[in-house]
Amino acid sequence: MCGGDVQGQGVASGCDEALERADSLRASDPVPVESGEGSVPGEHSQELETGASEETLRERVNVLQEQYLRKAADLENYRKRALRERQEAVEHAYAALLADIVAVLDDFDRAIEAADHASSTEVEASSAFREGVLMIRKQLSSVLETKYGLEYYPVLGERFDPNLHEALSMSPSASVHEKIVGAELQKGYRVRNRILRHAKVMVLTPEEQTEPDRGDGPSE
């Protein structure tokens, strides 16, 4: 034990040095830190900033994803619209061409009809002519129908429909109860279910039903 009366001054000095040394050793020993305590200053705030940055990035990614999907949808709609407009332009060009060719078919029909009404002295010659014209017309009609979708639609006896028929004349008839196509004056054609030329027709209409005049009653 340091500081006794029997010891000299040298011993007291040695005790002082030992105490100082013990103090210095205690100061240099690491202080035990419990879990969750003693973290580096600023570390918690840094973690908060990192979390906020990740959330911001997620939101940004979501925004970019939505923008991409919208742009992709707009591009697809544009592609479909351009394709549709191109198809309509092609069909319009076809329709203009086919409208002219239909007039040629009318000429064939007139030639065939003229051959049918030939005089007896011309029957043999007109029959051969008729067969030749009819064959050419059939071939042309087949090509137009197969390649371009042109087709003739029959109308005789059909119910009158202004979407299909153009009435050039009307005739009252007791044999009908509604407007009926009574005669085909010019053939109608359509291209892939779209009317190219309306059929020109004569329409039979119901006769007006009128009550007979009964007068004012029996006379006295």
Curated annotation (Swiss-Prot):
It is found in: Cytoplasm. Residues 1-55 are annotated as: Disordered. InterPro entries: GrpE (IPR000740), GrpE_coiled_coil (IPR013805), GrpE_head (IPR009012). Pfam families: GrpE. Keywords: Chaperone, Cytoplasm, Stress response. Its main location: cytoplasm. PROSITE patterns: GRPE (PS01071). The keyword Transcription does not apply. It comes from the Bacteria. The keyword Hydrolase does not apply. GO terms for biological process: protein folding. GO terms for molecular function: adenyl-nucleotide exchange factor activity; protein homodimerization activity; protein-folding chaperone binding; unfolded protein binding. GO terms for cellular component: cytoplasm. Homodimer. Participates actively in the response to hyperosmotic and heat shock by preventing the aggregation of stress-denatured proteins, in association with DnaK and GrpE. It is the nucleotide exchange factor for DnaK and may function as a thermosensor. Unfolded proteins bind initially to DnaJ; upon interaction with the DnaJ-bound protein, DnaK hydrolyzes its bound ATP, resulting in the formation of a stable complex. GrpE releases ADP from DnaK; ATP binding to DnaK triggers the release of the substrate protein, thus completing the reaction cycle. Belongs to the GrpE family. This is Protein GrpE. It comes from Treponema pallidum (strain Nichols).
